[in-house]
Amino acid sequence: MKAIKYIVLILFGVISINVCAQNNNSERFAIKASAEIGLGNSISSNSYISSLSSKATTGSYGLDFGWTFWSQKGHRLEANIGVAYSPAAIELELGSFDYNYGAPATADMDGESYQRYYEISNLHQKVSLGRVTLPIYLTYGYKCNGWFGLHADLGVRFGFKTNATISEVSGEAYSYGIYPQYDNLLIDESYLNDFGTTNLANAGYGTPVCNGFSTSVLVGVGAEFSISKHLGADISVRYNRGITNLFKEQYSGQDFTNASAPINYSVSDGQQVKSLTDYLSSSKVSPLSLRIALIYRF
């Protein structure tokens, strides 16, 4: 019996503790359907642009399977493994920002290279992310009475990116170029269809660069309430430490003068503007969340 216990623990990769109420000691298995909501501003970020601000919401919806491998006098140890889908929505705001780059010869009508300048104002960008997460944790629990118990969680959570899209953009971009063949005179003419002012609403979007894999340590405390003989409800607070680099580092500073444009999406008339997500050096999910679950024990 002990060998089976150790094999199951190794298989689950468990490093967690979860205290659960139980209706009777014969219940060895549990199915837990849960929803988890991020608390506060769920994404914090570092950026090369000091005026860039962000706010976000996160959530998680999943199903866990638990196996009680030890119980005695109201105490229980339980191994858990599950799967969940975790969507996130991040809104980025920027009042104004300027940058420039050396455009290649192919960008010009007569095959000459030139310097292009951008002035961005009132830029708003919304990014939608999705991840599949695999929580693996242990359970220690104390049954206070027939309908109420306390629990504490300790484990790990693995995350895998499923999608990342720029779902909304608004703001304005004004661009112009300096051409060496015209003795560095400022050129701003309507026939250059990628110059002038462009409204960025309904632009054609690129894909934000996001880390495809993440890992965090899962810690939680909460209470379980009995609803019927086998059905219970659980409310807990969880702390997921270690989910970092949701966005990868792209550049080492604010100097974007180079041979190719630092571009992620463009609008229909050819005006190009860099995605705000590329200016994030790093970001991370807020570690604190509220979890509500329905539990069926058998």
Short names for language-model regions:
Residues 117-121, 134-136, 142:
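Short acidic (Asp/Glu) patches
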Residues 33-37, 61-69, 83-85, 134-140, ...:
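Residues on the lipid-exposed face of transmembrane beta-strands in outer-membrane beta-barrel proteins
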Residues 25-33, 73-79, 130-132, 146-152, ...:
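Outer-envelope beta-barrel architecture signal
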Residues 215, 222-224, 231-252:
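Extended, basic/helix-rich recognition subdomains
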